[in-house]
């Protein structure tokens, strides 16, 4: 099982997170807007962290030290 962090929970990020989670990956989603996590739906079984995806503390809370893959799918390069 791979550990994946998805930064950004918009249309693309939420679809990616759900697909990876459905396929058995351990997924954590980071987004600066807590309301964005509603895009994941009720069946998402991963975790979420509210914050900015380039903040070290946020990344540590998301499990970056055990992460196999990090996908940045935000609207902006610096989100």
Locate the predicted segments by residue.
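Cytosolic regulatory regions of ion transport systems
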Residues: 1-79
């Amino acid at each position: 099982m791979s550990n994946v962090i998805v930064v950004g929970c918009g249309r693309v990020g939420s679809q990616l997170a759900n697909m990876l989670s459905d396929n058995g990956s351990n997924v954590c989603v980071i987004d600066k807007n807590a309301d964005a996590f509603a895009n994941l739906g009720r069946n998402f079984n991963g975790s979420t962290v509210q914050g900015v995806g380039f903040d070290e503390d946020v990344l540590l809370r998301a499990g970056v030290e055990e992460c196999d893959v990090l996908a940045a799918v935000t609207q902006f390069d610096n989100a």
